Amino acid sequence: MPRWDQTRQIRGRLDAEVGTLRRVAARRLALCYPSPYPVAMASLGYQTVYRLVNGRNDWAAERAFLPDEDGATAAGISTYESETPVAEFPALAFSVAYELELAGLARFLDQAGVPARREERRADQPLVVCGGPLTYANARPLGAFADVVVSG
């Protein structure tokens, strides 16, 4: 999908949303989901973290999702709120629900221009934090991708 079509799709989704938060804060993170938008927006945990982070005065969370099958572009992955490439954020926080999303996590990072494997990332690239339901069942596979794994 060309970049302008992706931007149009994102703006259409934002126009249909209720409760979108656009904030400016001293600290920002990209709140990422390793599946497409409709799957992420069905996750109460993902929405709760979005509200909790944005409820703080000193933090702002912007959302990013694995593009739909036809939504991948050479331009990478940007956040919905400011259209900032996720590779420009200091931290990427992922909610990973189950093992099948590990492939989506690797694809997301690759499409975003961030090395998927932890040991391949440089110090000037985003810190990758993983949490979500998978951490309760089997957090070990996340270690290949995450700099930090948070239970929950």
State where each predicted segment sits.
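Residues at alpha-helix termini
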Residues: 56-57, 112
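Glycine-rich beta-alpha loop elements in corrinoid/cobalamin-binding modules
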Residues: 66-152
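A structure-centric signal for secondary-structure junctions around beta-strands
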Residues: 26-28, 125
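Short N-terminal or domain-adjacent regulatory/targeting segments
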Residues: 1-25, 73-78
